[in-house]
């Protein structure tokens, strides 16, 4: 009896092979032939799962996004104080270990490539800015955001902070390490929030 292959699982394996090729050779080396070889498939077999190279690259890009989103969803349901929850979510969006640094390197390579292929994937609609707006709204709903804060501008500042930290953490992970990233994000969040009495009670029961 022929071995049945999980179609979606194989597509994800091919996407992960695409990441490895990009990390080793850059986007210019992410040809269908190189990806097929990395995935241990013939070119014809690769075409069975993805009819075009852009279809494969779009899927591989979205898979990176889904991995981060899944980790954020896991944090969102945890029983944490609001500022701590926001901090943990933001830390998931900045590379702080070998795995997430690789993901970020692939993501930046994809977004640079996708700038000229809006029909493939519009990086300006990657959900990150809307995520920042949701976090600012969450702080506001928790009565923590400073009263006169401009929520739209604060979302933009948070986006710029996370994006900049992500780039610098990828380029210089020794200097921009997890501890420094956490301190920068914590100080920024504290600067836009009022004191949380629940945190005070937790420190001084």
UniProtKB/Swiss-Prot annotation:
Limits of the HTH tetR-type domain: 8-68
Annotated DNA-binding residue span(s): 31-50
GO MF term list: DNA-binding transcription factor activity; transcription cis-regulatory region binding
Transmembrane segments: none
Domain of life: Bacteria
Any single Pfam family the record assigns to this protein: TetR_N
GO biological process, one term: regulation of DNA-templated transcription
Gene3D superfamilies assigned to the protein according to its UniProt record, in alphabetical order: Tetracycline Repressor, domain 2
Entry keywords, A to Z: DNA-binding, Repressor, Transcription, Transcription regulation
InterPro entries: BetI_C, DNA-bd_HTH_TetR-type_CS, Homeodomain-like_sf, HTH-type_TetR-like_transc_reg, HTH_TetR, Tet_transcr_reg_TetR-rel_C_sf
Keyword Iron-sulfur: no
SUPFAM superfamilies xrefs: Homeodomain-like, Tetracyclin repressor-like, C-terminal domain
Function in brief: Transcriptional regulation of the polyketide synthase operon.
Identification of the protein by name: HTH-type transcriptional regulator PksA
Gene transcribed to yield this protein: pksA
